[in-house]
Curated annotation (Swiss-Prot):
Changing residue 280 to W: Preserves membrane binding and ability to tubulate liposomes. The gene is ACAP1. A zinc finger (C4-type) spans 420-443. Highest level in lung and spleen. Low level in heart, kidney, liver and pancreas. It comes from Homo sapiens (Human). Residues 265-360 form the PH domain. Cells overexpressing ACAP1 show an accumulation of ITGB1 in recycling endosomes and inhibition of stimulation-dependent cell migration. Cells with reduced levels of ACAP1 or AKT1 and AKT2 show inhibition of stimulation-dependent cell migration. Cells overexpressing ACAP1 and PIP5K1C show formation of tubular structures derived from endosomal membranes. Changing residue 711 to A: No effect on interaction with ITGB1. This is Arf-GAP with coiled-coil, ANK repeat and PH domain-containing protein 1. Changing residue 461 to A: No effect on interaction with ITGB1. Residues 1-226 form the BAR domain. PH domain binds phospholipids including phosphatidic acid, phosphatidylinositol 3-phosphate, phosphatidylinositol 3,5-bisphosphate (PIP2) and phosphatidylinositol 3,4,5-trisphosphate (PIP3). May mediate ACAP1-binding to PIP2 or PIP3 containing membranes. Only one PH domain of one ACAP1 dimer inserts into the membrane, while the other PH domain acts primaryly to interact with adjacent ACAP1 dimers. The BAR domain mediates homodimerization, it can neither bind membrane nor impart curvature, but instead requires the neighboring PH domain to achieve these functions. The modification 3'-nitrotyrosine is found at residue 485.
């Protein structure tokens, strides 16, 4: 043990000893101050550590709560469970570290302050008392006169006693100083050692805890990397869809209701206004859904659904042109009826078509469930003749020659129409009326999901078919359309799906064929095409269109302009040229497939449109084809004359009837201020005058809320049949009436 104070110097009580005493006392006083400060800091550290520990445990609980949010995700649940257990173990180790730190502070530092320094203070007090007593004895002994022997002897005895007491206390003080000096070194170093060992134990336990998760962390990192890549792809797709939807929204397009095929059949959902059945007849907006062969609605998601039609097979749907509100249709069941209102004409047609398709799907499913049937049970088609009829003025199936079977047989008799256009399943009973192809029920559902701007789906057995539409289907067909939309399939070595392929494969094929148009024959650059005749000088001839073998006597057998001349035309100009006399439906379909605007305006011919061009050619089928593909029945030329004006001027009664059925504006006036009725009266065309006056009467009755009678429908139906089946007779009739 190193001796800081020399005992010999202590006995001598030399100035060196006194100086050493003062120095040691100053050091011990500073030590006491610093130890007390360390204790205070340690107490603050422990308090902060416990706050940190409590906050950390609350933080871990918050992480655990994330696993209970939303639907269970196994990967996230496993990750959070493993990491929260590990974090809790680390926090337990941290609590042990705090306890060890507190114990070390109490055992080493606090003991040193309370016990070691207390003995030092007592020894110091005794030392200085002894020093004062010795000083007083020395002074008294020195002051005793020589003549006072007795007093001198007493003073000497007191001095000896004081010196002995001082020396004993001085030796005790010196010993206490030396002991406290050494104890200070040992206790402080032991305190630091224990503190570091507690820290080492804490971090060692944390390292071991995290090491157990090392492999899992690596695997999770790889999985997260893949998830990030997938998320980036999804984000890119969402951004692209966001841009498309934003452009669509800025373009003023209406949102379409959701239509898809679900496990319980066709599913369509969207908002409709519903008229209450109470005395006030109030209208309320509700969320309607067609699913599981039922029509239901609800106000809020958590509200129970209200069933409007329990079984779609026992109901019919019809338009309500006589209603005070626009865009109304009625669903009529055996026990009640429900008047509904869409937001626009297009949404109205979508909803009506969806209800009809759902009715068809319900009957098809019932027929599959009940098959095979006996000969006496019937086919099951005629039983639903009135259930799916659209009360819009079209021909009902019961009035068609031959009924349902006649339409199916007539359409399927066209070359290639006996099997589905997209998957080749035999006996298709659905059709896309704007494309002119037949489809199986599964492909028809996929076509319906594309939207009516790509494909308008109708049932061959369940929907009403106007005679001109049946004839249009027979003029086009699967072979012609596939020669257009599948022109490069063999060159691209693409495999066409078969009847046994999955829905996903068929859906991918149909999307690539009609939406992406991957298999079309590529046209020259737009820069190289023109709207006039011929082609630019120096440009090589365009390869001819796919060879199409038409039937003799049909529109497909009419001569077409040379392919070299057509190939140099803009798709819109090509559509315009093909719509003229003589019209060519295959070329028109080809132009539309290549992006032709169905309302393309020919500035060189008085801003005429393809529909006006087809009207001039008196082609009922070309006009029907253009209208089915979105042609505007009211778009006028530079003289302010629309298709109805031109049909009236030219005396084409069948076309006038067609345009009136498609909503042509009766009050539209040309640049000379004449409406179609004025023109018809000037040309003395009795048939067209009759049609126009009937249409005006129908409008007036609808404006007054009157239901009207069936005469209007019967007359229009007769003219439609005559225009489709015997157009020459209709032309002769118009000529005879004109000459009377």
């Amino acid at each position: 043990m190193t001796v800081k104070l020399d005992f010999e110097e202590c006995l001598k009580d030399s100035p060196r000893f006194r100086a050493s005493i003062e120095l040691v006392e100053a050091e011990v006083s500073e030590l006491e101050t610093r130890l007390e400060k360390l204790l205070k800091l340690g107490t603050g550290l422990l308090e902060s550590g416990r706050h940190y520990l409590a906050a950390s445990r609350a933080f871990v609980v918050g992480i655990c709560d994330l696993a209970r949010l939303g639907p269970p995700e196994p990967m996230m649940a496993e990750c959070l469970e493993k990491f929260t257990v590990s974090l809790n173990h680390k926090l337990d180790s941290h609590a042990e570290l705090l306890d060890a730190t507190q114990h070390t502070l109490q055992q080493q530092i606090q003991t040193l302050v309370k016990e070691g320094l207390r003995g030092f203070r007592e020894a110091r007090r005794d030392f200085w008392r002894g020093a004062e007593s010795l000083e007083a004895a020395l002074t008294h002994n020195a002051e005793v006169p020589r003549r006072r022997a007795q007093e001198a002897e007493e003073a000497g005895a007191a001095l000896r006693t004081a010196r002995a007491g001082y020396r004993g206390r001085a030796l005790d003080y010196a010993l206490q100083i030396n002991v406290i000096e050494d104890k200070r070194k040992f206790d402080i170093m032991e305190f630091v050692l224990r503190l570091v060992e507690a820290q080492a134990t804490h971090f060692q336990q944390g390292h071991e805890e995290l090491s157990r998760l090392s492999q899992y962390r690596k695997e999770l990192g790889a999985q997260l990397h893949q998830l990030v890549l997938n998320s980036a792809r999804e984000k890119r797709d969402m951004e692209q869809r966001h841009v498309l939807l934003k452009q669509k929204e800025l373009g003023g397009e209406e949102p379409e209701p959701s239509l898809r095929e679900g496990p319980g059949g066709l599913v369509m959902e969207g908002h409709l206004f519903k008229r209450a059945s109470n005395a006030f007849k109030t209208w309320s907006r509700r969320w309607f859904t067609i699913q599981s062969n039922q029509l239901v609605y609800q106000k809020k998601y958590k509200d129970p659904v209200t069933v409007v039609v329990d079984d779609l097979r026992l109901c019919t749907v019809k338009l309500c042109p006589d209603s005070e509100r626009r865009f109304c249709f009625e669903v009529v069941s055996t026990s009640k009826s429900c008047l509904l209102q869409a937001d626009s004409e297009r949404l109205l047609q979508l909803w009506v078509s969806a209800v009809q398709s759902s009715i068809a799907s319900a009957f098809s499913q019932a027929r599959l469930d009940d098959s095979p049937r006996g000969p006496g049970q019937g086919s099951g088609h005629l039983a639903i003749g009135s259930a799916a009829t659209l009360g819009s003025g079209g021909m009902a199936r019961g009035r068609e020659p031959g009924g349902v079977g006649h339409v199916v047989a007539q359409v399927q008799s066209v070359d290639g129409n006996a099997q589905c256009c997209d998957c080749r399943e035999p006996a298709p009973e659905w059709a896309s009326i704007n494309l002119g192809v037949t489809l199986c029920i599964q492909c028809s559902g996929i076509h319906r999901s594309l939207g009516v701007h790509f494909s308008k789906v109708r049932s061959l057995t369940l929907d009403s078919w106007e005679p001109e539409l049946v004839k249009l289907m027979c003029e086009l067909g699967n072979v012609i359309i596939n020669q257009i939309y599948e022109a490069r399939v063999e060159a691209m070595a693409v495999k066409k799906p078969g009847p046994s392929c999955s829905r996903q494969e068929k859906e991918a094929w149909i999307h690539a064929k009609y939406v992406e148009k991957k298999f079309l024959t590529k046209l020259p650059e737009i820069r190289g095409r023109r709207g006039g005749r011929g082609r630019p000088r120096g440009q090589p001839p365009v390869p001819p269109k796919p060879s199409i073998r038409p039937r003799p006597g049909s529109l497909r057998s009419k001569p077409e302009p040379p392919s070299e001349d057509l190939g140099s035309l803009h798709p819109g100009a090509l559509l315009f040229r093909a719509s003229g006399h003589p019209p060519s439906l295959p070329t028109m379909a080809d132009a539309l497939a290549h992006g032709a605007d169905v309302n393309w305006v020919n500035g060189g011919q008085d801003n005429a449109t393809p529909l006006i061009q087809a009207t001039a050619a008196n082609s009922l089928l070309a006009c029907e084809f253009l209208l089915q593909n979105g042609a505007n029945v009211n778009q006028a030329d530079s003289a302010g004359r629309g298709p109805l004006h031109h049909a009236t001027i030219l005396g084409h009664t069948g076309l006038a009837c067609l345009f009136l059925k498609r909503g042509a504006d009766l009050g539209a006036r040309d640049s000379e201020g004449r409406d179609p009725l004025t023109i018809a009266m000037e040309t003395a065309n009795a048939d067209i005058v009759t049609l126009l006056r009937l249409a005006k009467m129908r409008e007036a009755e609808a404006a007054q809320g009157q239901a009207g009678d069936e005469t209007y429908l019967d007359i229009f139906r007769d003219f439609s049949l005559m225009a489709s089946d015997d157009p020459e007779k209709l032309s002769r009739r118009s000529h005879d009436l004109h000459t009377l």
